[in-house]
Amino acid sequence: MADGILKVGTITNSAGSGNITIGSGVTLLSNTPAFEAYLSADQTVSDGVNTKIQFDTEIYDTNNIYDNSTNYRFTPTVAGKYFVYSVLLFKSDTASQIDDTTLRLYKNGSQYKRVNTNITTGNTTTLILDVTTVMNLNTTDYVEIYGNLNIGSGTAIIEASEKSTYFGAYKLGA
């Protein structure tokens, strides 16, 4: 271990097989609580209006920390640092140009992070934005995702997709 790296292929007990017991005083880190949810049906949004995204289908929710039916928000049950992420797929229902889009992450009702794009040329009718951050959260904080889409004409839509419109978070083990 001259370079400070321990490389191990197999660990066995003193008899050469069996389970290894972790002794007292050892801290095991976990990335829970955690959740991920997605939008199961397209959500129509008013053109140019900041709208809460209603991620209504949970993929997993280890500690009942995500409300997928009323407030569409994440409220941690354990204080700590959390990795929080979201992706939104914006689209126009016609061949109308998307002018700009914004994805906002809110903490306790106020904007915490924002990602946006402005389209100046071309005929873009779909666009994906994502946001990731590490947040210090207590048990009464809550996090929500908002989207805003400006289009030339037609209907502004956040497209439903487990693979491209989702929201999740997990507690960092440290």
Question: Residue locations for each model-derived region?
Answer:
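Extracellular jelly-roll beta-sandwich "head" domains, especially the C-terminal globular C1q domain
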Residues: A2-L6, S14-S17, L28-A174
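FIC/Doc superfamily catalytic core
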Residues: I11
